């Protein structure tokens, strides 16, 4: 097994042609604070199951096959998301990534060393013929339409904006309404603005706020500061940028009307993704040959495959999840869905890695 300087882990099954670029498959093992047990994990375990099946069946391939576990995909502790795959793809600077800090001021680089997973292999030095990522949909479409497989053609781009509102701490009971500099009121109005912006770009755009930090967070104190993160996503570049631009234009006006301060900073960004046609067709062909119901789908979430797609042909296989629920401890899938997704992954990889008879 190889480990690079960002902690990405690679397990290789040799091919008959040692000079041929490998076919990769995998995902991530990190999770959300209250995340489920299939987000990311399915893709890594599915890759290992493919590897085990090839060994059990004594199937040889021309190209080596690699299972990869990408580090810090979620970006929960160390923002942004897909940090290590972003460095691998040359999108993010490695030293910048090492300097990302958590809520306690500890850096990603320091913690990578502490847990013993800062490898010696230079990040991004590996050649990739193609990569496939198996993942749960994290949405309700496949289950609602009774589809076994989602053939992912595109990935949504996103803008994460960190917004800091500065009001004035004051007693909630004795401060007259007209004399307040109320950051929490600003939060409420900006939450509504985020929703309005997303609803103006239906059916594909989404917008929301998932993180809110209120200070001092006391029941009878008007907050002096509120920090929250806006998440805008769309598969269309113009729409995505337009959503960000409208928020940046209108949010300061709302803050000014309330007499509170506002700062808006970019916390994360990537452009919409179009996955490789050949890899997408390999997935679709596998689903059709195996008799699984399927449909094209756009990934609403960001994935490591979105970054890797910049340096190698890439595509994704998706399977349904119960009620579309993800980033939740109740996240669940059926054995049949997991089996179908892994089966399609196996055959797409074999088509690409070329079976040696």
Where would I find each of the regions flagged by the language model?
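Flexible, glycine/charged-enriched surface loops at secondary-structure junctions
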Residues: 4, 60-64, 119-124, 174, ...
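Short beta-alpha connecting loops at secondary-structure transitions
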Residues: 95-96, 233-236, 267-269, 324-338
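Zn-dependent metallopeptidase/amidohydrolase metal-coordination segment
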Residues: 2, 26-27, 294-344, 349-352
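Acidic, glycine-rich active-site loops and adjacent beta-strand->loop/helix elements
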Residues: 7-9, 29-32, 65-76, 138, ...
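A short beta-alpha structural unit
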Residues: 210-217, 229-236, 261-280, 300, ...
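Acidic/His- and Gly-rich active-site-bordering loop/insert found
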Residues: 1-36, 54
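Midchain, well-structured core segments that form catalytic/ion-binding scaffolds
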Residues: 73, 77-238
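Alpha-helical metal-binding/catalytic segments enriched in His/Glu/Asp
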Residues: 25-28, 34-74, 159-165, 171-197, ...
């Amino acid at each position: 097994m190889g480990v690079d300087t960002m902690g990405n882990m690679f397990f290789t099954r040799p091919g008959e042609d040692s000079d041929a670029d490998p076919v990769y498959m995998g995902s991530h093992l990190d999770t959300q604070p209250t995340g489920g047990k299939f987000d990311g994990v399915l893709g890594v375990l599915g890759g290992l199951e493919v590897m085990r099946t090839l060994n059990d069946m004594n199937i040889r391939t021309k190209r080596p096959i690699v299972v990869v576990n990408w580090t810090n995909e979620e970006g929960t502790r160390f923002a942004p998301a897909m940090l290590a795959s972003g460095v691998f793809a040359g999108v993010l600077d490695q030293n910048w990534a090492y300097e990302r800090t958590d809520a306690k001021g500890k850096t990603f680089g320091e913690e990578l060393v502490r847990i013993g997973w800062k490898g010696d292999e230079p990040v991004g030095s590996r050649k990739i013929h193609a990569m496939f990522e198996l993942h749960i949909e994290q949405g309700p479409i496949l289950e609602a339409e009774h589809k076994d497989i989602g053939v992912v053609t595109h990935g949504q781009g996103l803008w994460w904006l960190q917004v800091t509102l500065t009001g004035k701490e004051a007693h909630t009971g004795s401060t007259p309404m007209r004399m307040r500099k109320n950051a929490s009121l600003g939060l409420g109005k900006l939450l509504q603005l985020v929703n309005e912006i997303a609803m103006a770009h239906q059916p594909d755009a989404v917008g929301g706020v998932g993180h809110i930090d209120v200070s001092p967070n006391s029941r009878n104190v008007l907050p002096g500061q509120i920090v929250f993160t806006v998440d805008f996503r769309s598969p269309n570049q113009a729409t995505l940028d337009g959503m960000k631009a409208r928020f940046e234009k209108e949010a300061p006006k709302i803050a000014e009307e309330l007499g509170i301060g506002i700062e808006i900073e970019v916390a994360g960004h990537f452009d919409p993704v179009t996955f490789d046609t050949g890899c997408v067709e390999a997935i679709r062909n596998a689903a059709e040959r195996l008799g699984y119901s399927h449909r094209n789908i756009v990934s609403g979430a960001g994935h490591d495959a979105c970054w890797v797609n910049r340096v190698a042909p890439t595509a994704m296989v998706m399977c349904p999840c119960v009620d579309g629920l993800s980033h939740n401890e109740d996240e669940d899938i059926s054995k049949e869905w997991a089996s179908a997704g892994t089966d399609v992954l196996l055959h797409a990889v074999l088509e690409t890695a070329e079976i040696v008879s």
